[in-house]
């Protein structure tokens, strides 16, 4: 993208997204919000498409969004926002003002610096202990947002905090892995060759035992371009079955994760 300061310039920049298009569709997943009484940070993934009927042209895209909020006179307002374009498909002429991401070959000399650097911009850095006052289900669901962000941004330090020391899982295509050290090491090597990743997903079900401090959740993997049935029902290309343990109030870690490919809609989702 590009840098803009001031309300009017930011609004004008967003208006360009529709300037050459008849249709603009965007959906958001992987939501996170954390903060205090007057300041907060947020992140989410966005995917969608821009279309031009007269050209029968379409541009598909996936983005990572993070930013900060301030509360003034009882109203929360956007203070800053970073938008990184992860991937695009289709007719680039519909968004010539966008700064395209590196190609499938990865970074090359002359490429611009990335918009988001997780080690500096991850929303969990500003308020590492900001969630105890929210319902436990939100804290549990947030674990997937943190996990997917860390993996997709190749932030292994943040990813390590997502897992308990005794964690294990069936991580396709790597297989069964036991122990946080082996999990993070395997993910680091698996992630290294890929110029980008983006794991869009919805948390579908959570069951927790507050007294024991354990939980289980089902997460549906969203596939942009095939995310809904014809009648609008959410559609998923795979699911995660995850078990978690509370480390301290408001913070949960994964103890087990397994990834299972296979299409299903929201009405027939796997259950905990």
Regions found by a protein language model. Name each.
Residues 54-56, 73-75, 211-214, 228-231, ...:
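Short, solvent-exposed loop/turn segments that connect beta-strands within catalytic domains
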Residues 26-28, 59-65, 199-201, 235-241:
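Short, surface-exposed coil-to-beta transition loops
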Residues 1-48, 156-225:
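A solvent-exposed, acidic/Ser-Thr-rich amphipathic alpha-helical stretch
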Residues 102-149, 153, 161:
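Short, low-complexity N-terminal intrinsically disordered segments enriched in polar/charged residues
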Residues 41, 62-119, 216, 237-272:
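Short beta-strand edge/turn micro-motifs at domain boundaries
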Residues 19-20, 57-58, 66-67:
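N-terminal functional module detector in eukaryotic proteins
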Residues 49-59, 223-234, 264:
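Short, cysteine-centered beta-strand-loop-beta hairpins and adjacent loop/turn segments enriched
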């Amino acid at each position: 993208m590009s840098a803009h300061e001031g309300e009017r310039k930011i609004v004008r920049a967003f208006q360009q997204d529709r300037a050459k298009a008849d249709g603009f569709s965007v959906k958001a997943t992987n939501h996170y919000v954390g903060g205090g009484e007057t300041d907060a940070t947020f992140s989410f993934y966005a995917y969608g498409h821009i279309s031009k009927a007269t050209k029968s042209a379409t541009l598909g895209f996936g983005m990572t969004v993070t930013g900060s909020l301030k509360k003034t006179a009882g109203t929360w307002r956007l203070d800053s926002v970073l938008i990184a374009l992860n991937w695009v498909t289709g007719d680039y002429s519909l968004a010539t003002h966008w700064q395209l991401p590196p190609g499938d070959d990865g970074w090359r000399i002359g490429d611009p610096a990335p918009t988001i650097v997780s080690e500096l911009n991850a929303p969990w850095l500003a308020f590492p202990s900001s969630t105890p006052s929210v319902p436990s289900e939100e804290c549990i669901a947030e674990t997937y947002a943190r996990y997917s962000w860390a993996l997709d941004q190749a932030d292994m330090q943040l990813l390590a905090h997502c897992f308990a020391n005794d964690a294990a899982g069936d991580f396709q295509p790597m297989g069964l892995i036991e122990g946080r050290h082996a999990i993070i090491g395997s993910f680091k090597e698996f992630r290294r060759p890929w110029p980008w990743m983006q794991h869009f997903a919805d948390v579908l079900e959570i069951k927790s035992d507050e007294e024991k401090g354990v939980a289980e959740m089902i997460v549906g993997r969203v596939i942009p371009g095939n995310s809904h049935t014809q009648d609008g029902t959410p559609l998923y290309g795979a699911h995660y079955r995850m078990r978690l343990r509370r480390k301290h109030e408001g913070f949960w870690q994964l103890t087990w994760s397994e990834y299972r490919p296979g299409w299903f809609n929201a009405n027939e989702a796997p259950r905990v």
